[in-house]
Amino acid sequence: MLSPYMSPIERVWFYSLRILCGLILLFLILPVLVIIPLSFNSGSFLVYPLQGFSLQWYHDFFASAEWMRALKNSIIVAPAATVLAMVFGTLAAIGLTRGDFPGKALVMALVISPMVVPVVIIGVASYLFFAPLGLGNSFFSLIVVHAVLGVPFVIITVSATLQGFNQNLVRAAASLGASPLTAFRRVTLPLIAPGVISGALFAFATSFDEVVVTLFLAGPEQATLPRQMFSGIRENLSPTIAAAATLLVAFSVILLLTLEWLRGRSEKLRTAQA
């Protein structure tokens, strides 16, 4: 909020900073804003100006066997990878947060390294690992590697939630006769659930949008929606791709709104514990 006691220089800085932030935001979302109208264009090319309004490309998307197979594959791979990432990421976060052992920082760096290692390197390494096993073009390898890419997000969000967790609640449950598993299920898990779900949503979005690893590990029968879009751009540029992209944007917006709701709920739980 602009204070009436600001000097002229402070006012200039105040407005300049907001204009700069607005320009950066516009730069980031402009490609998205450009592609959405094209998905409703009646013309057969991804060009402006629009020739008219039409839902033809959405009809073509849902009527195409290739696009539906890609969508089905994404619906298979992303939830499965999310479940694996959520389970292993949560367990790793609990162990790294509560444990105190030599090399803890190194272990943390290793488990979150998929976030910083170039995805193409992960794709090549995964192919070289799974191909000799006969799993180069399989859902199994695709799900496992997508889960590996999602685990760091779960670890980070769950670890952040555990930082404000009151361990006295677990001790109180143990003093009342609860086993460690019961205490985790009835006390710990409900309180860290916002962090777990937030990490799971990040892992799901990562898997659902991933294309580089999929190019290395998926055959034609395992092609996901992003890979189908990539192939379409290279082979047959059609506004159907814009329709698919718009659906992905809508899905991403829903995920962001869900994450924002979970963030608010997590803040309320942390305040209540304090």
Describe the function of each predicted region.
Residues L2-E10, P79-V111, L128, Q167-V170, ...:
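Transmembrane-helix boundary motif in ABC transporter permease subunits
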Residues L2-I19, S159-A174, P180-L189, A242-A274:
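C-terminal transmembrane helix and the adjacent membrane-cytosol boundary/short C-terminal tail
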Residues S3-S7, L46, L50, L55, ...:
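Membrane-interfacial helix termini and adjacent extracytoplasmic/periplasmic loops
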Residues S7-W13, G43, Y58-E66, F208-T258, ...:
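Interhelical loop and adjacent transmembrane-helix boundary motif
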Residues I19-L20, L25-V32, V148, I155-Q167, ...:
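Transmembrane alpha-helices
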Residues L26, M68, K72, I76-F88, ...:
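Hydrophobic alpha-helical transmembrane segments of multipass integral membrane proteins
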Residues L30-A65, L215-P220, A274:
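Short membrane-interfacial helix/loop motifs at transmembrane-helix boundaries
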Residues R69-I76, L128-F153, T157, A193-G195, ...:
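Loop-to-helix entry region at the N-terminal start of transmembrane alpha-helices
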